[in-house]
A protein has these predicted regions:
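Glycan-recognition and catalytic cores of secretory/periplasmic carbohydrate-active enzymes
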Residues: 1-128
């Protein structure tokens, strides 16, 4: 459950909660995200689309609960993700922490970025 592919649905539950508040709508999101935040790990977001999937969950849950830990951990996870995927020279993100240059190269030996993933990273900032 501590994986963006499973957590992305929490965005919808948070949105539904704002339409008609009912603690049951966000109970599982709160349980999972607060458990995740209680661990010492900061490497949950190691792939570009994970940022799109979970960053908005963190901001939405902060808005609904007022718990500042959501924003603190968002910053911690974002810092980790940037450290392994962001190429400051190009201003772009690699697909994930395993596809970084020079470990992974394009067929012509150059840096290999993933346009869709970079789009998701930018969209993540717009979803909250």
């Amino acid at each position: 459950v501590l994986f963006g592919d499973y957590q992305i649905c929490f965005q919808t539950y948070a949105d539904l909660y704002t339409v008609k508040p009912d603690s049951g709508k966000i109970a599982r999101a709160r349980e999972v995200m607060e458990y995740q935040m209680s661990t010492d790990k900061d490497d949950y977001w190691w792939w570009a689309d994970g940022l799109y999937m979970v960053m908005p969950v963190m901001t939405k849950m902060y808005k609904l609960t007022g718990n500042p830990l959501y924003l603190e951990k968002l910053h911690e996870y974002w810092t980790y993700a940037n450290s392994i995927m962001y190429d400051a020279e190009e201003g772009l993100y690699y697909r994930d922490g395993k596809y970084i240059y020079p470990k992974h190269k394009s067929v012509n030996g150059k840096k290999d970025f993933w346009a869709r993933g970079d789009g998701w990273v930018l969209a993540a900032w717009q979803r909250y």
